[in-house]
Amino acid sequence: CLWFKCWLVECKENEMTYCCALRLEQGLVFISDTRTNAGVDHISVFRKLHTFGVTGERFIALQTAGNLATTQAVIGHLQNALILQQEPNLYSINTMFEVADLVGKTLKSVLEDISSDTQEQMNYACSILVGGQIKGGDMQLYNVYPQGNFICATTDTPYFQIGESKYGKPILDRALYYAMPLDDALRCSLISFDSTLRSNVSVGLPLDALVYSKDSFVIPMGKRITEDDPYFSQISRQWSDTLRRGLQEMPKPTDDYWR
């Protein structure tokens, strides 16, 4: 509708975010922060991890990064299609590939609507991670680009990041592997977020975390991690201590390195 398009064009708030999703042998792990900003004087909290599903049949999770109005429009269109029973929708299609394709087409359509309504040179793009499982198929994880195309996670590359990814990438590259147990993978992902939070003010608590077990076909409740969360605070402290201790235990550089 017209008022929604006008709001979409005027909204300049961006999800300066970090989202991480893992597709492993035993299941899927999703973590997103919640910070958005339209400048240093306007910082807000918005959920960026969205779930859909039918217990016993399908579980779908979407994570968003980019222009807030664009991402909310995409989620809104997908939800409206379910309410109005429009075809295709997230509950009527049969494979996760089709889910990623539907999300990509919806995103592309939203961006085309924006470009037809404004000549302003502003980035309204966003990226979306799509993961889940539909009965009869395997778990899948996709990275959907603003152009509507997408790529799939593999056993060799079992994770995707969107947003402010560089600070949290090293621990994933060094420690994560496809057969890693889900609890270890969750811990690895939380350390990735702790590293990002320490180095980038545009990413902030609270975090939303969710773990899906393969072939369970349930919609997990998930966990909101706040500043006073005891476990997250504990692993943050222990990770810092482990790095300092590991540095001290490394062999000292030989004279030809620095003398």
Positions of predicted regions on the chain:
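Short, Lys/Arg-enriched N-terminal segments with co-localized hydrophobic residues
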Residues: 1-15
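Conserved short S/T/G-enriched processing/targeting/catalytic segments and their helical context
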Residues: 12-15, 19-116, 162-180, 234-259
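A generic local secondary-structure boundary/capping motif
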Residues: 18-20, 48-52, 114-120, 129-131, ...
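Short, flexible beta-strand-to-coil junctions
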Residues: 24, 67, 131-137
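Ordered hydrophobic segments in well-structured contexts
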Residues: 29, 61-63, 127-129, 141-143
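Short connector loops at helix/strand junctions that flank enzyme active sites
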Residues: 57, 123-125
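A two-mode feature
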Residues: 99, 106, 110, 125, ...
